[in-house]
Amino acid sequence: MAVCSSSSLILLTVFLSVAVETRPSSDRDEEQVLKSLFGPHLTSLILAPPTSNDSTEGSSGSPEPPTPSEAPVLIHGDRGTASQILRSFLRQREKTRRWGRKPMVAGGGCFGMKMDRIGSISGLGC
């Protein structure tokens, strides 16, 4: 019995190894799928190996400081204007917030009466 099961195990292993070797490569299929989805140009970029100047996620290299032409320019006159705009915006929000709230009616919550079950009023809510 042991000889029969070990020989069938060996036969099964040989059969599976031959089946795996004769299977067509899936690399070609992936390339065709990528071409159909993204087009030939993006497919070539996706399949290309990464270059040394590519930054990878989590890389420990420090970013280079921006060149003077790329750096944001702050003019002292604009600074006061920006703060005035911000203050007026915050004041406007504060006014609308005060006028937007309605006084709560006794027993009412944010969305009216709160009911836990049929016929029982809840004190929970906002």
From Swiss-Prot:
| Cystines in this chain | 110-126
Q: In which tissues is it expressed?
A: Brain and spinal cord.
| Region described as Disordered: spans on this chain | 44-80
Q: Does the keyword Chaperone apply?
A: no
Q: Which locations, inside or outside the cell, does it occupy?
A: Secreted
UniProt propeptide residues: 23-102
Q: Which GO terms describe its molecular function?
A: hormone activity; hormone receptor binding
List, alphabetically, the SMART domains matched.
Answer: NAT_PEP (SM00183)
> What processes does the entry annotate via GO biological process terms?
blood vessel diameter maintenance; cGMP biosynthetic process; receptor guanylyl cyclase signaling pathway
Q: What is this protein called?
A: C-type natriuretic peptide 2
PROSITE patterns in alphabetical order: NATRIURETIC_PEPTIDE (PS00263)
The signal sequence is 1-22
State what this protein does: Exhibits natriuretic and vasodepressant activity. Has cGMP-stimulating activity. May help to regulate body fluid homeostasis in a variety of aquatic environments.
Can you list the GO cellular component terms from the UniProt entry? Answer: extracellular region
Family assignment? Belongs to the natriuretic peptide family.
Recorded hits in PANTHER family, A to Z, give: C-TYPE NATRIURETIC PEPTIDE (PTHR12167), C-TYPE NATRIURETIC PEPTIDE 2-LIKE (PTHR12167:SF6)
Q: Which Pfam families match?
A: ANP
Keyword terms? Cleavage on pair of basic residues, Disulfide bond, Hormone, Secreted, Signal, Vasoactive
InterPro entries from the entry? Answer: Natr_peptide, Natr_peptide_CS, Natriuretic_peptide_brain
Predominantly, its location class is secreted
